[in-house]
Structure formats: C-alpha cells, structure tokens
A protein has these predicted regions:
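Alpha-helical phosphate/pyrophosphate-handling elements in metalloenzyme active cores
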Residues: 125-160, 186-199
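Divalent metal-dependent phosphate-bond-processing catalytic cores, especially two-metal-ion Mg2+/Mn2+ enzymes
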Residues: 77, 82-102, 131-132, 142-157, ...
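Basic nucleic-acid-binding interfaces
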Residues: 9-66, 70-72
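Short, well-structured alpha-helical segments
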Residues: 113-121, 134, 138, 158, ...
Length: 310
C-alpha cells in the first residue's frame, strides 16, 4: 500500500494544489491524512486536495511523488477512483440528459419534462442523503444499461424500468420508526402524482407499471417471470457486488444516512438486514446479475456481518 502525491498543478484560492491518494485503501489514505493534520474537508471522494506549500512536508512523511498521469493510472487500477461523471456538476448534467431521453419521440411537452426532471433531481439531492443520492441514481441507471447489454430482458416497456429507477428512492425520509416500505410507498404515490400530468403524455399502463416496480424495491423479491422487476431489483443491489473498498464506501454512506441512530441500534438493525440478505436465495434474479455480482456480494455481506459481530 502506497500513498501517492502528484505535482501541484490545480489552481484554486490563489495557489495550486496537489492530489493525495492511496493506491490500495481509503483507510490508509485517511490515516495518513489524520497523521499529517489534513482537514477532512480537503477530502473529495477519492483524494485529498493539498496546497503546494504542504507537498514537501507530506513527501517527508512518506507520500511518494509521482506524475499526474501515474497517479491517475494507479488510482484507477486500485478501483478507488470515482469517475468524473459521478462528480456532482457533471453527474447532474448526465442525469438531466438521461431523463430527457426517456421522453424523446413522445408527445410530452419539453418544458414539462424539464420541470419534472429538475424537481425529481432536487429530491435526490436533499441534504440528509449520503447514499440514496444522485450518484446512486446514476449507478442504478448504468446498471440497467449493463444488464440490458448483457442480454437481460427489460419486460414489455424498457422505459418503465428506467422511469422506476428515477422514482425508486425519490422519497427518502430514512425514518427507522416508519413502517417497513413507507419510503417506497410514498415514492410510488409520487409516480402517480408526477407521471399522470397530461403534459408528460405517459400512458396509464406505463404509470401503473412504474408504480408497481417502485413498490417492488422495498423487498427486492420479484416474481419468477417478472423480467422488469428482476432487472430493477438487480440494478438497485449492484452496489453489494462491488470491490471491498467500494462496498466499504457504500456502508459508510448508508451509516451517514442513519447518523441519528445510535451505534447499538445501527448494529442491531444493520445486522438484521445482513442476515436477511445472506439467508435469502439468489440476491440477483437476472442471469447477468448473478454472474457478475452474486459471489462478490455474498463475500462483502459476510465480511460486514462478521465485523459487526466482532
């Protein structure tokens, strides 16, 4: 494991900045940053921004100087790099384009489409969200694309699956005292509030299907021949099958979503969720989903469960 730093070349705040990364572990990177006295606010998803006047000090503490190109190459190889499209400003542009494409070739009013998409994205960017945010929305949409390219069926209307992805966490209160599935029920109600606007020209049967799919994400248990449900469920659970480092980021973000819950209550509730997932049948219901993510997901879930019990 190595902490790397590139030359200061990124201008901001009257100086230039280097990037400080680890080629193996975010835990290693954070530990190094704490020891060096770097502010947590300097961390940006996969790196710390370091002003030029501190670079020599960090090299003396053990950071290895490399070129910018080498730093990016090794960060990407580690699996820790957060793609540029996932950063907020670029991500939101990508999402807006994806939303607009769902209405291309229909009778929908462009202004109504833009307004509905903007309102939905505002919900996804609420300040209390850490995991259930636009990055998760984009990941689900990209996973739907991946599964479709790999041969998974989308059901009778591929647009319905993608619309359901947009709505599946559109309402997210994160209230542990609420009945199970309340957020999904409220999100399904939002489907009907938004998509029945005649200016969006969404057929009634598509609205019904989108609402059904959103409700399904409460349990992730689609019926055996529910192709659309299987695709959306698998895309929503894709995060479980990522690398151990990416999975750790997911768990940390979910914990932030429940920061108001005590550690003891978190461990108890999270343990129950993990047990239910581990005791279930296949986590993924499409053949491509099982092939790509099942084994890694079970390793990640088992490792987290063991850590909670330690």
């Amino acid at each position: 494991m190595t902490v790397l730093i590139d030359p200061p070349a990124w201008p901001a705040h009257g100086t230039v900045f280097s990037h400080l990364v680890s080629d193996a572990s975010l835990e290693e990177l954070h530990a190094f940053a704490r020891a060096a006295g770097l502010s947590e606010r300097a961390f940006d998803r996969d790196h710390y921004d370091v002003p030029a006047h501190r670079r020599a000090e960090l090299v003396a503490l053990g950071a290895v100087p490399v070129t910018g190109r080498e730093l990016v190459r090794r960060l990407a190889a580690s699996g820790l790099r957060v793609p540029a499209r996932s950063r907020a400003e670029k991500r939101d542009v990508v999402l807006a384009r994806r939303w607009a494409r769902l209405f291309e070739g229909t009778a929908a009013s462009p202004d109504a489409v833009t307004t509905a998409g903007r309102d939905l994205l505002a919900r996804w960017t609420e300040p209390h969200r850490h995991y259930h945010d636009p990055a998760h929305l984009l990941a689900v949409l990209e996973s739907v694309d991946l599964l479709e390219r790999a041969g998974a069926e989308t059901g009778p209307d591929p647009r319905a699956v993608r619309l359901a992805a947009w709505f599946h966490d559109a309402v997210y209160a994160g209230d542990p005292a609420a009945p199970a599935g309340q957020d999904e029920a409220d999100s399904a109600a939002l489907v009907r509030d938004v998509l029945t606007d005649p200016r969006l020209a969404v057929p009634a049967d598509v609205v019904d299907e989108v609402a059904r799919l959103v409700l399904l994400t409460a349990a992730h248990d689609p019926a055996p021949h529910d192709a659309a449900g299987a695709m959306l469920s698998d895309a929503d659970l894709e995060v479980l099958g990522r690398s151990p480092e990416a999975y750790a980021r997911y768990v940390a973000a979910v914990r932030q979503d429940y920061a108001h819950v005590s550690d003891a209550d978190w461990a108890r509730g999270r343990g129950a969720v993990l047990d239910a997932l581990l005791d279930a049948g296949p986590l993924y219901r499409t053949a491509p989903g099982r092939a790509r993510w099942e084994a890694a997901a079970r390793r990640n879930l088992a490792a987290e469960r063991a850590a909670l019990s330690a």
